[in-house]
Regions:
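Short intrinsically disordered terminal tails
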Residues: 1-2, 9, 95-102
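An N-terminal amphipathic alpha-helical segment
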Residues: 2-44, 48
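Acidic, low-complexity, intrinsically disordered interaction modules
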Residues: 31-90, 95-99
Length: 102
């Protein structure tokens, strides 16, 4: 498995190359032994007025971009910070071999 820093950089490159309005804000390892995976949180910036539909569309494009780079991805949780009006989503991501973007 690649390092957390390399994963974060590669995921941000996938986001940037796909012109998505997301930012990787946290990455860590999770799971145990042979069932380990990366847990990655992305933020959607200020969408204003709780525009969940737009955010879901961006997250769907993010998941498609990650999958097209050979990784398995699933949604763990998502929430909205009502004070800052920022959307957050945490994903589980797994790749058995190779690197993102190769």
């Amino acid at each position: 498995m690649m390092t957390i820093g390399k994963l974060t950089d590669n995921l941000q490159n996938v986001i940037d190359n796909s012109n998505l309005e997301l930012e990787v804000i946290h990455s860590e390892m999770d799971g145990k032994n042979n069932d380990s995976f990366y847990k990655v949180t992305v933020s959607g910036g200020k969408n204003g007025n709780g525009k969940w539909g737009e955010y879901f569309s961006i997250l769907s494009k993010f998941a498609d971009a990650v999958e097209s780079n050979g990784m398995e991805i699933w949604l763990v949780k998502m929430h909205n910070d009502a004070f800052d009006d920022v959307f957050y989503a945490t994903f589980g991501i797994r790749r058995d071999e190779g690197e993102i973007g190769q």
